[in-house]
Amino acid sequence: MAFDLAARLAERRAADLYRQRPLLESPQGPEVVVDGQRLLAFCSNDYLGLANHPEVISAWQAGAERWGVGGGASHLVVGHSTPHHQVEEALAELTGRPRALLFSTGYMANLGAITALVGQGDTVLQDRLNHASLLDGGLLSGARFNRYLHNDSASLASRLDKAVGNTLVVTDGVFSMDGDLADLPALADVARGRGAWLMVDDAHGLGTLGAQGGGIVEHFGLGVADVPVLIGTLGKACGTAGAFVAGSEDLIEALVQFARPYIYTTSQPPALACATLKSLELLRRETWRREHLAALIRQFREGAQQIGLQLMDSPTPIQPIVIGDSAQALRLSRMLRERGLLVTAIRPPTVPAGSARLRVTLSAAHSEAQVQLLLNALAECYPQLENADA
């Protein structure tokens, strides 16, 4: 029987769920050129405005001159260069952990950590709103896999009572589509009380949370005993690319031995690691970036409340505006684009059915005036959706 791909694609179009790739024709930044149109963007994860920072660019260029442009081999053959090792040491210091291990992508870090730690006869428990890479890792591990209610430590506790073997509890730190924080103190307490390990994917918290930018674990004042497995990505607040796992000496050595996505892939370009070293330096040194970002978040939330927008409970740069209907979310996104603003509509299956939204993301590179432009446009466009539904 032939694959009927055309029917699957037609079904997705009919449900207003068809995805398309905008063509970015400029560097990352608040002002971009997309599909030939100059726009003010509020949809990038470049939270600290480092993706196009001149010092980071210069570090990449110098790294390419010194180390070339290719990793050449896997880390376990001859691909683990000095810059890679230096980044791992810097990440261990930033997160307050003995060791860190560099991965090429966040997806690979999550799959590698979960599948190396649990397997048949074990249990993995995950928040129902976790990122797809975490859910895929749980399914691929072969362990008993179950999901607890979102951010609900009581729901987790009831599932832990039925767990078998080594048990890994997995949660996002900042939930990427809602922007809310995992209740790590409560989750860690429940996990430790039942002998389970807690793994946190802090993709959206690293750099934006904590006094030093160490992320959600620093934000809550927790340590390795509370969160034995910490994941972070480098393509968001750090502005470069890649990911890492941070934890104990034994954890990192176990991943080197058993994490297949780490073992069986070519290392990232050493010059990229040089750029990341510079971005980590800026992340820690230029604390004004987090301070300015926090001020923009307050400005947006106060302005959105005055307009009557339905926001999530988010203290982070991720500020979703819940619309509900996918077609209406697309319509609002189009109206904003007609006014020179780029805000992406997020639809199922990325978010639950009936919860389509505009995912506004703020950056330290934005100005207060630019955020006000967005609020003004939303004040003009959002009531038109309400009128259309009346």
Curated annotation (Swiss-Prot):
Residues given in the record as pyridoxal 5'-phosphate binding sites: G106, Y107, S176, H204, T233
Any one GO MF annotation of this record: 8-amino-7-oxononanoate synthase activity
Cofactor requirements of the protein: pyridoxal 5'-phosphate
GO biological process, one term: biotin biosynthetic process
Binding-site residues, substrate: R19, H131, T350
EC number: 2.3.1.47
Keyword Transferase: yes
This protein's name: 8-amino-7-oxononanoate synthase
Lineage: Bacteria, Pseudomonadati, Pseudomonadota, Gammaproteobacteria, Pseudomonadales
